[in-house]
């Protein structure tokens, strides 16, 4: 990269480039032909059988470990990025040899050995080694047309990481990396990528003027062992100003589909498809002004989530959010639109409180258990008097007369209007 100089364009022919780490200079462009793959793993081809297990010797890699205490329930070795794959499927790590079973591996770091629970002969076995594919603090970098896979990216770090201003990351497939797939900073753009099956999370971004558009973000957050409610799922955006998240398809992620968390202001979510994400659809948390409009939601959150958790659209200790013209199908479970207030302190632009939020002109399909409204377990009076409003929405419910509309307490649809004055211009359709 240095030999090319600032502003140079690099072309990668089709082929697999293993364990490469690229640090672009200012204004450089990296383009890939169809079939150009940056692969952060080492092929494992030699195994010996020891006591019914298969062993690869000489494995000296040991990636940086972050947040090993943020474990998903039952996970072993969360935050250990030294993943092992068989036929493009990540195996599950265990922390002792006596727990080794089919579908798992044990990395004995003291002996530089990887033990497998299954016979690897005739299979493609790979071990993640390199911590990133493309990363630097340079400005104005473009990355396009690559497949980027199987990097030992630490928790919260990305295989493609644009730490400078104005990166454009487009038309890549980014998959099977331990931590995050893609990260960008201010005035960066993530466009038309397929970001899937990364261990912790698909996307991450922070800064001003960011555009996230046209991406498919799928099946992330399942195998790093990190608790996705701490951080994981489809994508998470922090300390942004003017963030635009538009026309993305975020689906089947473990965690939220899309998540703005901590001091985001002037955010727009527009025209996104958000489907079948385990924790909920869009969560706007401890942040400020946002517009969430013209999105569609199907099957997010699921059953078993209490209160208004797991809403298709969740506004959590945030203010000045307008939610309108969204379509929400929660007929398979989960909640609709939830405004939630807890004790979260204050941030860059004032208190983290759930006030001045407007929910209008949305269409929702709910079960009799699916909730809508505003709830608090801290300073409820401030939330109730804080200018939050619901109006001109259309609700399709399987049964009438249920207490599924919340404004502090829970009410029937009729009392939601008559008692607390919410959704007076809205309609409820039963059946």
Regions found by a protein language model. Name each.
Residues 1-431:
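Extracellular parallel beta-helix/beta-solenoid repeat domains
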